[in-house]
């Protein structure tokens, strides 16, 4: 297990899922003083059919009872709405596709929760993320999780050094089947609970239905790059680059994909074929840079992920100014999407990254 300097008092973020449950059980088994915290980060729909917050809190309490630890329920809903959800809506309004889970980690789980835990006298917080941490010459390095199918370092790239120093990831060296086996061995009620999917505050509800509650929609044309109308979209914010499903374009030939959004004309630009050149990018510009180490990485060669679970892509990092950098890829990358995060790696070390603003293709048109 990766720890800080001999922490004794650890507060675990218990989400009601199997990963955080096993995290708490392992730490208790290893002799640490462990407490749990269930974070209530969403309130708007906590009585509707799609919201799992109540069940998740019941599961977290049941896990704490079996393990034999205390648990607090702490409400961060106001902070979440201000720091995460407002940004989520702002980005969709601008035609981009944000990743709120990245911001939730940086602003809620490793800021609000960390501040709360320190205020309660904790030395360290622990979460069920599949990531690792190593301390080398006093520097805390964020590394990919051993289970490459579950590695979540991509979602943690905005953590600062002071946050990493206070965090541990007990599952980082385990694979998911082993975590399930341990949950059954500990007789935890979450052992067979399915993993959560989608954005945390949306849950299993239809995305379009959810977003329409908060943002106005405006139907428009689906057009080819040559300007031919081939269909109608139901609102640009409901589509993301590279999307194939749900376009409703008939006819023969290869499948259609979203290639760009023209915000001025309210048009969705679509192309036929997965290998259409407009879907491929050789470079991107990212801003709002954030790095996990005390010094930002030097310009040079690294690998990058522009979306979760993609294979690392070799690239060249070039700084444009203090807050902006360009990445130039060795090979064209498919469906690089503004609003998503570009995350840099040096081998297994997660260095940080930024928010994708533009690419060498006109994917968000605002002229």
Swiss-Prot record:
Interaction with target base in tRNA as annotated region, ranges: 99-101
Annotated segments matching region Interaction with tRNA: 150-152, 307-308
Chief subcellular location: cytoplasm
A GO CC term attached to the entry: cytoplasm
Biological role: Catalyzes the 2-thiolation of uridine at the wobble position (U34) of tRNA, leading to the formation of s(2)U34.
Family assignment from sequence similarity: Belongs to the MnmA/TRMU family.
Listed name of the protein: tRNA-specific 2-thiouridylase MnmA
Native species: Neisseria meningitidis serogroup B (strain ATCC BAA-335 / MC58)
């Amino acid at each position: 297990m990766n720890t800080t300097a001999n922490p004794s008092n650890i507060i675990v973020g218990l989400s009601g899922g199997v990963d955080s449950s096993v995290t708490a059980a392992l730490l208790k088994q290893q002799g640490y003083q462990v407490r749990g915290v269930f974070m209530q980060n969403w309130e708007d729909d906590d009585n509707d059919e799609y919201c799992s917050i109540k069940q998740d809190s019941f599961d977290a309490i049941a896990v704490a009872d079996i393990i034999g630890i205390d648990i607090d329920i702490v409400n961060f809903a106001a902070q979440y709405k201000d720091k995460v959800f407002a940004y989520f809506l702002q980005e969709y309004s601008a035609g981009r596709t944000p990743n709120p889970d990245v911001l939730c980690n940086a602003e809620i789980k490793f800021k609000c929760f960390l501040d709360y835990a320190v205020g309660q006298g904790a030395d360290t917080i622990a979460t069920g993320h599949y990531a690792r941490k190593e301390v080398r010459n006093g520097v805390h390095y964020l590394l990919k999780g051993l289970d490459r199918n579950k590695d979540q370092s991509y979602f943690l790239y905005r953590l600062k050094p002071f946050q990493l120093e206070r965090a541990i990831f007990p599952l980082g060296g385990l694979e998911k089947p082993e975590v399930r086996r341990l949950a059954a061995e500990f007789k935890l009620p979450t052992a067979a609970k399915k993993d959560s999917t989608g954005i945390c505050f949306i849950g299993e509800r239809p995305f379009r239905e959810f977003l329409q509650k908060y943002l106005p929609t405006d139907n428009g044309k689906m057009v080819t790059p040559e300007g031919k109308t081939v269909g109608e979209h139901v609102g640009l914010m409901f589509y993301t680059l590279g999307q194939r499903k749900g376009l409703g374009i008939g006819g023969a030939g290869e499948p259609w994909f979203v290639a760009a959004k023209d915000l001025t004309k309210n048009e969705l630009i679509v192309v036929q074929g997965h290998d259409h050149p407009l879907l491929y990018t050789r470079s991107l510009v990212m801003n709002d840079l954030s790095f996990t180490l005390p010094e930002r990485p030097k310009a040079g060669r690294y690998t990058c992920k522009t979306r979760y679970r993609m294979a690392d892509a070799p690239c060249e990092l070039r700084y444009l100014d203090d807050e902006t950098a360009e990445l130039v890829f060795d090979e064209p990358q498919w469906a690089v999407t503004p609003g998503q995060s570009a995350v840099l790696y040096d081998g297994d070390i997660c260095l940080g990254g930024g928010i994708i603003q533009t690419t060498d293709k006109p994917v968000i048109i605002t002229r």
